[in-house]
């Protein structure tokens, strides 16, 4: 057996291609690698004297085959998977594929596909195949060069190029090489997959679900494939294109890096994309152009990924600008520059956006009102933005607020109370939801969420003043006027909020009262506004440091009564919130919610810089300070600074000598709960050892 292996190894270079050394370093199934693999797989225990020598020999043979010093982990896995793939192939295909010495799994798959596409034809040598194919396809210009590079660099996919973007940089006297290629037949179907009767393959077009990307790029790929002179060439071109597209899909699910996000923002700032996206955020052509711009810079992203990232950046920027997030967004300056440049530009007509007609319009960062950009409320965040997790978790315990909201009816508007939910975790939780409705007080009215959803579902250019949800869009001028009059709720001349039409005083119902908002109270320190003076008083305690609520047990002060109630449970030992899965109890509902995420695996807080995810907001805030370099917590005694509040609290106890965590066995005190947990393992070991001693007796 070993003699056969040695005979195979004796002349490994006689049939070796001289250009093989210039290819990738993997050389997965080259003759040398195949001989090493066979020596490893065919090694017998009887060839050595003992188990130690057998194990050492196997180790040596495995290193000769996989070469861990020169190969990465991915390359070693590639070799193992390639070996198993070749083993499970049918014998008639396996023999021929092994003779071709595929260098990686992708090349092996391509060889098997070639055999299956032409089962009755003789498969030629790869270089000969290439020469014949290039000779037949010589008139195809750019397509020929694409095929040559795809054939020779199957392992390393080339960066995609887009003729549409390149043609814009050509001089007027030049003509793109792509236009010299023969045109596809004019009767080529555009809505269905065209079945190639000679090869049994399906040529995918724009309307079908194929391996290539859809819409314009799918049509381009289909036409280039149709230009191939024969069925074999079309099959080869299709295989190369599919392998190229498979690398694009590798970027799916990969977090956005810092440089990649900066490149996306640079593309937005150097074009009219950002302004167009404010009028139509679901325009697929714009996101496709953004993806092409990223591809030209070496970043592989799909249009849908560009759309999701753009809306995530918008959401983060909007939160920071409105004071909802204490730490600044890392790309705040870039987004602020984009928003300012678009706001100063003249308003664009709806028909200036390519492909807007017939597309779904979403409510975005800005909205047109009488030709001027005005900020929209947080309630208009669409479904895609709602998928981007808020910095606060909406699933935590909420309190109910009675907020007067304007509801539409057939005669106009009326005020009703709507239950509002807000997070208890933030100290200004009660004023956040009210502040969202009042911080843009120039609007003059509250909008009900159901009314907003109905407005968002209509295109901006077609939004009409409606009398009822079921009313038709097409109306006579008199009907439209009456419908518009019923929508205006003031008893004096006003400008309509939705469409900008002026309404005289006579069109309003005399019995309708004028809409008035409660006076807004503003904090002189930070400028935040509140609908009630009591909310302002409570907020000012943050600046003054006042803590009127004192614990009768330890004297600790709190600015909120709810925080004092939660603190008292540490003295009484009350833990009313219990986990339904493991039975663990907590004294705060927010702690239970964070704990439950350990069972569900939910991590709603994701860093936009590195993509790392967290299951609670405190860890997320501390992590973001790593990127910004911020350390807001400073010890007044020694001057040491911290970026994490929990570490800062533990450090302060070293100065005060406070040890709130005590062992129930020996009454020893600790400054950290983790230190107490480690200490309790000592007692547990002692208990277990004593039980084992009694069992032995």
Curated annotation (Swiss-Prot):
Subcellular location: Nucleus
Keywords for the protein's UniProt record, in alphabetical order: DNA-binding, Isopeptide bond, Metal-binding, Nucleus, Repeat, Transcription, Transcription regulation, Ubl conjugation, Zinc, Zinc-finger
Domain KRAB: 212-296
MF terms in GO: DNA-binding transcription factor activity, RNA polymerase II-specific; identical protein binding; RNA polymerase II cis-regulatory region sequence-specific DNA binding; zinc ion binding
Biased composition (Basic and acidic residues): 383-395, 451-461, 472-482
Zinc finger (C2H2-type) residue numbers: 521-543, 549-571, 577-599, 605-627, 633-655, 661-683
Cross-link (Glycyl lysine isopeptide (Lys-Gly) (interchain with G-Cter in SUMO2)): 152, 163, 400, 685
Ranges where the record places region Disordered: 1-33, 144-177, 347-395, 451-482
GO terms for cellular component: nucleus
Key word Ubl conjugation present: yes
GO biological process, one term: regulation of transcription by RNA polymerase II
Compositionally biased residues, Polar residues: 10-33
Domain SCAN box span(s) in chain numbering: 37-119
Protein family per UniProt: Belongs to the krueppel C2H2-type zinc-finger protein family.
Cross-referenced PANTHER family: ZINC FINGER PROTEIN (PTHR24403), ZINC FINGER PROTEIN 2-LIKE ISOFORM X1 (PTHR24403:SF105)
Known function: May be involved in transcriptional regulation.
Record's protein name: Zinc finger and SCAN domain-containing protein 32
Species the sequence originates in: Homo sapiens (Human)
């Amino acid at each position: 057996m070993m003699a056969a292996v040695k005979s195979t190894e004796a002349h490994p270079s006689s049939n070796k291609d001289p250009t093989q050394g210039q290819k990738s370093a993997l050389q997965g199934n080259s003759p040398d690698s195949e001989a090493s693999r066979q020596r490893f797989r065919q090694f017998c225990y009887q060839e050595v004297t003992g188990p130690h020598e057998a194990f050492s020999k196997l180790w040596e043979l495995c290193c000769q085959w996989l070469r861990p010093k020169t190969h990465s982990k991915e390359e070693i896995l590639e070799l193992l998977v390639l070996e198993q793939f070749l083993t499970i192939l049918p014998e008639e295909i396996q023999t021929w594929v092994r003779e071709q010495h595929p260098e990686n799994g992708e090349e092996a798959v391509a060889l098997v596909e070639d055999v299956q596409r032409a089962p009755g034809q003789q498969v030629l040598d790869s270089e000969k195949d290439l020469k014949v194919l290039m000779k037949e396809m010589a008139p195809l210009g750019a397509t020929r060069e694409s095929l040559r590079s795809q054939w020779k660099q199957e392992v390393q996919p080339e960066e995609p190029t887009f003729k549409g973007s390149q043609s814009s940089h050509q001089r007027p006297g030049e003509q793109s090489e792509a236009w010299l290629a023969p045109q596809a037949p004019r009767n080529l179907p555009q809505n269905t997959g065209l079945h190639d009767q000679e090869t049994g393959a399906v040529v995918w077009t724009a309307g079908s679900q194929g391996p290539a990307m859809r819409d314009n790029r799918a049509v381009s790929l289909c036409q280039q494939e149709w230009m191939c002179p024969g069925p074999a060439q079309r099959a080869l071109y299709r295989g190369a294109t599919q392998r190229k597209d498979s690398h694009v899909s590798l970027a799916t699910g990969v977090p956005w890096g810092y440089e990649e996000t900066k490149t996306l923002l640079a593309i937005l700032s150097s074009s009219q994309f950002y302004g167009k996206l404010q009028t139509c955020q679901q325009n697929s052509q714009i996101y496709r152009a953004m993806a092409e711009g990223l591809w030209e810079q070496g970043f592989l992203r799909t249009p849908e990924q560009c759309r999701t990232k753009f809306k995530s950046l918008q959401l983060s920027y909007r939160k920071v600008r409105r004071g909802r997030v204490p730490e600044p967004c890392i790309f705040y300056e870039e987004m602020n520059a984009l928003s300012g440049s678009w706001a100063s530009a003249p308003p664009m007509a709806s028909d200036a956006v390519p492909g807007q007609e017939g597309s779904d319009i979403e409510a975005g960062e800005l909205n047109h009102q009488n030709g001027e950009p005005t900020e929209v409320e947080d309630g208009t965040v669409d479904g895609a933005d709602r998928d981007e997790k808020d910095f606060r978790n909406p699933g935590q315990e909420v309190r109910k607020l009675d907020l007067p909201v304007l509801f539409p009816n057939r005669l106009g508007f009326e005020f009703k109370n709507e239950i509002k939910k807000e997070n208890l975790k933030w100290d200004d939780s009660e004023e956040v939801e009210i502040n969202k409705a009042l911080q843009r007080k120039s609007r003059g009215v509250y909008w009900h969420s159901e009314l907003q959803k109905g407005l968002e579902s209509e295109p901006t250019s077609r939004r009409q003043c409606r009398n009822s949800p079921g009313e038709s869009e097409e109306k006579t001028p008199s009907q439209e006027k009456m419908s518009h009059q019923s929508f205006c709720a003031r008893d004096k001349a006003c400008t309509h909020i939705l469409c900008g039409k002026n309404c005289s005083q006579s069109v309003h119902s005399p019995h309708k009262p004028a809409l008035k908002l409660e006076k807004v109270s503003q904090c002189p320190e930070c400028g935040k506004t509140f609908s009630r003076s009591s909310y302002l008083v409570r907020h000012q305690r943050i600046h003054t440091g006042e803590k009127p609520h004192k614990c009768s047990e330890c004297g600790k002060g709190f600015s909120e009564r709810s925080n004092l109630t939660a603190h008292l449970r540490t003295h009484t030992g009350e833990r009313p919130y219990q986990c339904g899965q493991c039975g663990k109890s907590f004294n705060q509902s927010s702690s239970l919610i964070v704990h439950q995420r350990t069972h569900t695996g939910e991590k709603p807080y994701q860093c936009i810089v590195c993509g790392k995810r967290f299951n609670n907001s405190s860890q997320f805030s501390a992590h973001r300070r790593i990127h910004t370099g911020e350390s807001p917590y400073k010890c007044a005694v020694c001057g040491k600074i911290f970026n994490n509040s929990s570490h800062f609290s533990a450090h302060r106890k070293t100065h005060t000598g406070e040890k709130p965590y005590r062992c129930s066995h020996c009454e020893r005190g600790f400054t950290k709960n983790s230190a107490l947990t480690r200490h309790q393992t000592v007692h547990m070991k002692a208990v277990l050892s004593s039980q084992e001693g009694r069992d032995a007796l």
